[in-house]
Swiss-Prot record:
Keywords from the named record: Cell inner membrane, Cell membrane, Membrane, NAD, Quinone, Translocase, Transmembrane, Transmembrane helix, Ubiquinone
Function: NDH-1 shuttles electrons from NADH, via FMN and iron-sulfur (Fe-S) centers, to quinones in the respiratory chain. The immediate electron acceptor for the enzyme in this species is believed to be ubiquinone. Couples the redox reaction to proton translocation (for every two electrons transferred, four hydrogen ions are translocated across the cytoplasmic membrane), and thus conserves the redox energy in a proton gradient. This subunit may bind ubiquinone.
GO cellular component, one term: plasma membrane
Localization: Cell inner membrane
Protein name as catalogued: NADH-quinone oxidoreductase subunit H
Enzyme Commission designation: 7.1.1.-
Family, similarity comment: Belongs to the complex I subunit 1 family.
Enzyme class: translocase
Membrane topology recorded in Swiss-Prot or TrEMBL: Multi-pass membrane protein
Transmembrane segments: 22-42, 91-111, 124-144, 168-188, 203-223, 255-275, 291-311, 326-346
Amino acid sequence: MIDWITSQGQGLLGAYWTPLWILIRAVIIVVPLLLCVAYLILWERKLIGWMHVRIGPNRVGPLGLLQPIADVLKLLLKEVMMPTQVSRGMYLIAPLMVLMPAVAVWAVIPFQAEVVLADVNAGLLYVMAISSVGVYGVILAGWASNSKYAFIGAMRAAAQMVSYEIAMGFALVTVLMVAGSLNLSAIVNGQNTGYFADMGINILSWNWLPLLPMFGVYFISGVAETNRHPFDVVEGESEIVAGHMIEYSGMGFALFFLAEYINMIIISTMTALMFLGGWAPPIDSVLTNAIPGFFWLVIKVFLLLSVFIWIRASFPRYRYDQIMRLGWKVFIPLTVAWLIIVAIWIKSPWNIWH
């Protein structure tokens, strides 16, 4: 069908079709992504409410399903107040610098076999590079606000995000080593081959099992990277109020939270692609293969996002020194050690990947 649409479009519009088709595909990704963020916030409030033996949002619409729409309207109608002491240009650019990398990452994320905006061979490298740019927007927000609270929050964010990016990078390098490719689709396809996959038990052939420490480190580091609870000292309410966002209101404030929730979805999607077989079903059968691969990926991402929320509801906030100690003294040495083990494993006669 996609080939038919492409051929018809080229016949009608000629050279104008290619940029228009790229724009259409980008809109097809971004609009559902924004809806996912809206209802992820509702799911978070509902799930935490159930964990606390509360009802959660239930006033706007049936079962509270229109609550995200009401929240968006509220933020759109709020006055954007700009304190007199801020550096105006940098203050306005900072939220966009946080949001744009979070959206740009989706250009190379495959949703199913051959369903991707740009199927580049260096997709994994692109994700690692673009996702690390958002920290500059956080630093810029803290600096431009000319507030002590905002600056402290920005410095905490910079140190925390850089620290955990190292562990995440090492975890992804091990996936690169066993897959032998930087192409995200090739990494997913490589997980669905081998002894267990031939038996129809795909779930045991995925990377989560042989790379279990890396799987745990990558996901927990992702929680820290997104400044989510219990790693949310960047915006610890009892210490520095909203951290680098303290001087923002209205849509400026909303853009930071939009980027945070998009990054949560990115971490969950990358975890599913790198370690949980992507769009492949856990069991290879006629029934599971009848379900489109996109839905299997959505199910895995939804479960991982629910773990994000479960962690928030269950654990107290760590002290800043504990967060730094976990990153530098536990995760980085662990990932380096497992990287060496995997390298030896690949060169040994017991290599299970090739």
